[in-house]
Protein backbone atom coordinates (compact mmCIF):
# COMPACT_ATOMS: atom_id res chain seq x y z
CA UNK A 1 0.00 0.00 0.00
CA UNK A 2 1.37 3.40 -0.97
CA UNK A 3 1.05 6.52 1.14
CA UNK A 4 -1.63 8.04 -1.12
CA UNK A 5 -3.75 4.89 -0.74
CA UNK A 6 -4.31 5.45 2.99
CA UNK A 7 -7.67 6.83 4.06
CA UNK A 8 -7.77 9.89 6.30
CA UNK A 9 -8.80 7.64 9.17
CA UNK A 10 -5.82 5.34 8.59
CA UNK A 11 -3.44 8.31 8.43
CA UNK A 12 -4.84 9.53 11.73
CA UNK A 13 -4.39 6.08 13.28
CA UNK A 14 -0.78 5.85 12.06
CA UNK A 15 0.10 9.18 13.65
CA UNK A 16 -1.61 8.22 16.90
CA UNK A 17 0.23 4.89 16.98
CA UNK A 18 3.55 6.66 16.55
CA UNK A 19 2.73 9.29 19.18
CA UNK A 20 1.79 6.47 21.55
CA UNK A 21 5.31 5.06 21.36
CA UNK A 22 5.01 2.40 18.65
CA UNK A 23 8.06 2.04 16.42
CA UNK A 24 8.06 2.88 12.72
CA UNK A 25 8.97 -0.75 12.03
CA UNK A 26 6.01 -2.09 14.03
CA UNK A 27 3.57 0.30 12.31
CA UNK A 28 4.91 -0.60 8.86
CA UNK A 29 4.33 -4.30 9.59
CA UNK A 30 0.81 -3.56 10.80
CA UNK A 31 -0.09 -1.83 7.53
CA UNK A 32 2.03 -4.10 5.32
CA UNK A 33 4.14 -1.26 3.89
CA UNK A 34 7.82 -0.41 4.00
CA UNK A 35 9.21 1.64 6.88
CA UNK A 36 10.01 4.38 4.34
CA UNK A 37 6.28 4.95 3.74
CA UNK A 38 5.57 5.39 7.46
CA UNK A 39 8.68 7.53 7.89
CA UNK A 40 7.52 9.87 5.13
CA UNK A 41 4.08 10.22 6.72
CA UNK A 42 5.67 11.20 10.03
CA UNK A 43 7.95 13.78 8.40
CA UNK A 44 5.19 15.30 6.25
CA UNK A 45 2.98 15.72 9.31
CA UNK A 46 5.74 17.58 11.16
CA UNK A 47 6.08 15.06 13.96
CA UNK A 48 9.39 15.05 15.82
CA UNK A 49 11.13 11.72 15.31
CA UNK A 50 12.02 9.95 18.53
CA UNK A 51 15.49 8.77 19.45
CA UNK A 52 17.82 10.85 17.32
CA UNK A 53 20.53 8.18 17.60
CA UNK A 54 18.49 5.71 15.58
CA UNK A 55 19.42 5.90 11.90
CA UNK A 56 18.55 2.38 10.81
CA UNK A 57 15.32 0.44 10.78
CA UNK A 58 15.02 -3.07 12.19
CA UNK A 59 12.63 -5.30 14.10
CA UNK A 60 12.60 -3.81 17.61
CA UNK A 61 10.21 -6.50 18.86
CA UNK A 62 12.31 -9.47 17.71
CA UNK A 63 12.96 -10.57 21.32
CA UNK A 64 9.45 -10.03 22.67
CA UNK A 65 8.82 -13.78 22.45
CA UNK A 66 11.58 -16.40 22.46
CA UNK A 67 10.01 -18.93 20.13
CA UNK A 68 12.87 -20.09 17.89
CA UNK A 69 16.42 -21.46 18.20
CA UNK A 70 17.80 -18.28 16.62
CA UNK A 71 16.16 -15.98 19.15
CA UNK A 72 17.39 -18.11 22.05
CA UNK A 73 20.92 -18.22 20.62
CA UNK A 74 21.23 -14.47 20.10
CA UNK A 75 19.81 -13.78 23.54
CA UNK A 76 22.54 -15.95 25.05
CA UNK A 77 25.21 -14.35 22.88
CA UNK A 78 24.14 -10.83 23.86
CA UNK A 79 24.12 -11.81 27.54
CA UNK A 80 27.69 -13.06 27.18
CA UNK A 81 29.22 -10.58 24.75
CA UNK A 82 26.92 -7.59 24.36
CA UNK A 83 27.03 -4.17 25.99
CA UNK A 84 23.89 -2.26 26.97
CA UNK A 85 23.47 1.41 27.84
CA UNK A 86 19.98 1.73 29.29
CA UNK A 87 20.05 5.51 29.70
CA UNK A 88 20.94 6.13 26.05
CA UNK A 89 18.93 3.10 24.91
CA UNK A 90 21.43 1.23 22.78
CA UNK A 91 23.06 -2.18 22.61
CA UNK A 92 26.45 -2.88 21.06
CA UNK A 93 28.18 -6.07 19.97
CA UNK A 94 31.88 -5.70 19.12
CA UNK A 95 33.95 -8.50 17.54
CA UNK A 96 37.38 -8.98 16.05
CA UNK A 97 37.76 -8.66 12.29
CA UNK A 98 37.83 -12.42 11.65
CA UNK A 99 34.34 -12.71 13.19
CA UNK A 100 32.77 -9.84 11.24
CA UNK A 101 30.42 -12.17 9.35
CA UNK A 102 28.77 -12.99 12.69
CA UNK A 103 27.59 -9.39 12.81
CA UNK A 104 26.20 -9.86 9.30
CA UNK A 105 24.16 -12.77 10.65
CA UNK A 106 22.87 -10.69 13.54
CA UNK A 107 21.85 -7.76 11.36
CA UNK A 108 20.00 -10.13 9.03
CA UNK A 109 18.32 -11.73 12.04
CA UNK A 110 16.89 -8.40 13.25
CA UNK A 111 15.87 -7.36 9.71
CA UNK A 112 18.41 -4.54 9.72
CA UNK A 113 20.82 -3.39 7.03
CA UNK A 114 24.57 -3.81 6.62
CA UNK A 115 25.07 -0.09 7.15
CA UNK A 116 24.56 -0.83 10.86
CA UNK A 117 27.98 -2.50 10.94
CA UNK A 118 30.91 -0.17 11.56
CA UNK A 119 34.51 -0.55 12.64
CA UNK A 120 37.13 1.18 14.72
CA UNK A 121 40.88 0.71 15.01
CA UNK A 122 42.34 -0.54 18.28
CA UNK A 123 44.56 2.20 19.73
CA UNK A 124 47.33 -0.26 20.67
CA UNK A 125 47.26 -3.15 18.19
CA UNK A 126 45.79 -1.08 15.33
CA UNK A 127 43.62 -4.07 14.44
CA UNK A 128 40.13 -3.43 13.15
CA UNK A 129 37.26 -4.17 15.53
CA UNK A 130 33.83 -4.41 13.99
CA UNK A 131 30.67 -3.57 15.87
CA UNK A 132 26.94 -3.17 15.44
CA UNK A 133 25.04 -0.66 17.54
CA UNK A 134 21.28 -1.07 17.88
CA UNK A 135 19.34 1.93 19.17
CA UNK A 136 15.79 1.95 20.49
CA UNK A 137 14.06 1.91 23.85
CA UNK A 138 11.59 -0.76 22.79
CA UNK A 139 14.46 -3.08 21.86
CA UNK A 140 16.37 -2.42 25.09
CA UNK A 141 13.22 -2.95 27.14
CA UNK A 142 12.74 -6.37 25.55
CA UNK A 143 16.31 -7.30 26.53
CA UNK A 144 15.69 -6.05 30.07
CA UNK A 145 12.63 -8.30 30.22
CA UNK A 146 14.97 -11.24 29.59
CA UNK A 147 17.35 -10.23 32.39
CA UNK A 148 19.95 -8.51 30.21
CA UNK A 149 20.87 -5.28 31.95
CA UNK A 150 23.55 -2.61 31.94
CA UNK A 151 26.66 -3.39 33.98
CA UNK A 152 25.93 -7.11 33.87
CA UNK A 153 29.56 -8.31 33.99
CA UNK A 154 29.89 -11.04 36.65
CA UNK A 155 26.24 -10.41 37.63
CA UNK A 156 24.45 -12.01 34.66
CA UNK A 157 21.00 -13.43 35.25
CA UNK A 158 19.36 -16.19 33.24
CA UNK A 159 16.33 -15.64 31.03
CA UNK A 160 13.29 -17.91 31.02
CA UNK A 161 13.90 -19.96 27.89
CA UNK A 162 11.60 -22.75 26.64
CA UNK A 163 13.30 -26.09 27.28
CA UNK A 164 13.59 -27.00 23.60
CA UNK A 165 15.70 -23.88 22.95
CA UNK A 166 17.98 -24.01 25.98
CA UNK A 167 20.86 -25.66 24.16
CA UNK A 168 20.76 -22.80 21.64
CA UNK A 169 20.78 -20.26 24.48
CA UNK A 170 23.75 -22.02 26.09
CA UNK A 171 25.57 -22.23 22.75
CA UNK A 172 25.21 -18.45 22.56
CA UNK A 173 26.86 -18.23 25.97
CA UNK A 174 29.73 -20.46 24.82
CA UNK A 175 30.22 -18.47 21.61
CA UNK A 176 30.42 -15.28 23.62
CA UNK A 177 32.21 -16.28 26.82
CA UNK A 178 33.46 -19.80 26.21
CA UNK A 179 36.81 -21.25 25.19
CA UNK A 180 37.20 -24.45 23.17
CA UNK A 181 40.40 -26.43 22.76
CA UNK A 182 41.37 -30.05 22.21
CA UNK A 183 41.69 -31.15 25.82
CA UNK A 184 38.99 -29.10 27.50
CA UNK A 185 36.31 -26.49 27.14
CA UNK A 186 35.43 -23.79 29.62
CA UNK A 187 32.85 -21.11 30.20
CA UNK A 188 33.07 -17.86 32.15
CA UNK A 189 30.02 -16.30 33.79
CA UNK A 190 28.16 -15.50 36.98
CA UNK A 191 27.34 -18.12 39.60
CA UNK A 192 23.74 -18.15 38.37
CA UNK A 193 24.69 -18.68 34.73
CA UNK A 194 27.13 -21.49 35.46
CA UNK A 195 24.73 -23.28 37.80
CA UNK A 196 22.12 -23.09 35.03
CA UNK A 197 24.55 -24.71 32.58
CA UNK A 198 25.46 -27.35 35.18
CA UNK A 199 21.81 -28.31 35.69
CA UNK A 200 21.09 -28.42 31.98
CA UNK A 201 24.05 -30.68 31.18
CA UNK A 202 23.13 -33.02 34.01
CA UNK A 203 19.48 -33.26 32.93
CA UNK A 204 20.05 -33.63 29.20
CA UNK A 205 23.49 -35.22 28.80
CA UNK A 206 24.00 -36.91 32.18
CA UNK A 207 27.18 -34.90 32.60
CA UNK A 208 28.24 -33.70 36.04
CA UNK A 209 30.24 -30.48 36.20
CA UNK A 210 31.07 -30.43 39.87
CA UNK A 211 33.19 -27.36 40.50
CA UNK A 212 32.61 -23.69 39.84
CA UNK A 213 35.94 -21.93 40.21
CA UNK A 214 36.84 -18.34 40.98
CA UNK A 215 38.16 -16.46 37.95
CA UNK A 216 39.23 -12.83 38.42
CA UNK A 217 35.98 -11.04 39.34
CA UNK A 218 33.73 -13.78 38.01
CA UNK A 219 33.42 -17.59 37.84
CA UNK A 220 34.49 -20.37 35.49
CA UNK A 221 33.70 -24.02 34.80
CA UNK A 222 35.88 -26.55 32.98
CA UNK A 223 34.74 -29.67 31.13
CA UNK A 224 37.41 -32.20 30.20
CA UNK A 225 36.46 -35.87 29.88
CA UNK A 226 32.95 -35.24 28.52
CA UNK A 227 33.85 -32.26 26.35
CA UNK A 228 33.08 -34.00 23.05
CA UNK A 229 29.66 -35.07 24.24
CA UNK A 230 28.85 -31.50 25.25
CA UNK A 231 30.12 -30.05 21.97
CA UNK A 232 28.20 -32.55 19.87
CA UNK A 233 25.02 -31.71 21.76
CA UNK A 234 25.37 -27.94 21.58
CA UNK A 235 26.86 -27.54 18.11
CA UNK A 236 24.48 -29.69 16.09
CA UNK A 237 24.59 -29.62 12.28
CA UNK A 238 23.65 -26.32 10.63
CA UNK A 239 22.98 -24.58 13.94
CA UNK A 240 23.38 -20.81 14.22
CA UNK A 241 26.80 -20.20 15.75
CA UNK A 242 30.07 -18.33 15.47
CA UNK A 243 31.67 -19.82 12.34
CA UNK A 244 35.13 -19.93 13.86
CA UNK A 245 33.98 -22.02 16.82
CA UNK A 246 31.62 -24.17 14.76
CA UNK A 247 34.48 -25.19 12.44
CA UNK A 248 36.73 -25.86 15.42
CA UNK A 249 34.09 -28.07 17.05
CA UNK A 250 33.49 -30.10 13.89
CA UNK A 251 37.24 -30.58 13.43
CA UNK A 252 37.70 -31.72 17.03
CA UNK A 253 34.82 -34.18 16.74
CA UNK A 254 36.17 -35.57 13.48
CA UNK A 255 39.65 -36.04 14.94
CA UNK A 256 38.19 -37.68 18.04
CA UNK A 257 36.26 -40.19 15.95
CA UNK A 258 39.31 -40.98 13.82
CA UNK A 259 41.41 -41.61 16.93
CA UNK A 260 38.73 -43.83 18.43
CA UNK A 261 38.18 -45.81 15.25
CA UNK A 262 34.44 -45.24 15.58
CA UNK A 263 33.75 -43.08 12.55
CA UNK A 264 30.03 -42.55 12.15
CA UNK A 265 29.30 -44.11 15.54
CA UNK A 266 27.26 -42.46 18.24
CA UNK A 267 28.85 -44.68 20.88
CA UNK A 268 31.91 -42.46 21.20
CA UNK A 269 31.87 -40.33 24.32
CA UNK A 270 30.82 -37.31 22.28
Regions found by a protein language model. Name each.
Residues 1-270:
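Internal intein/HINT superfamily modules and their associated LAGLIDADG
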Amino acid sequence: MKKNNFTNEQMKDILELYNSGNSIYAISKLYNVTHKVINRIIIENNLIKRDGRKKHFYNQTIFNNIDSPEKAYWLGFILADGYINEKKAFMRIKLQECDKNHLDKFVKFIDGDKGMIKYETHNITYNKQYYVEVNGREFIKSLNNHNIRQGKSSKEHIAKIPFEYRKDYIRGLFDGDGHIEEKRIDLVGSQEVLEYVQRYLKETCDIHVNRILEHCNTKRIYIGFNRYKVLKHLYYDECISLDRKYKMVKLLLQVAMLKSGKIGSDSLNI
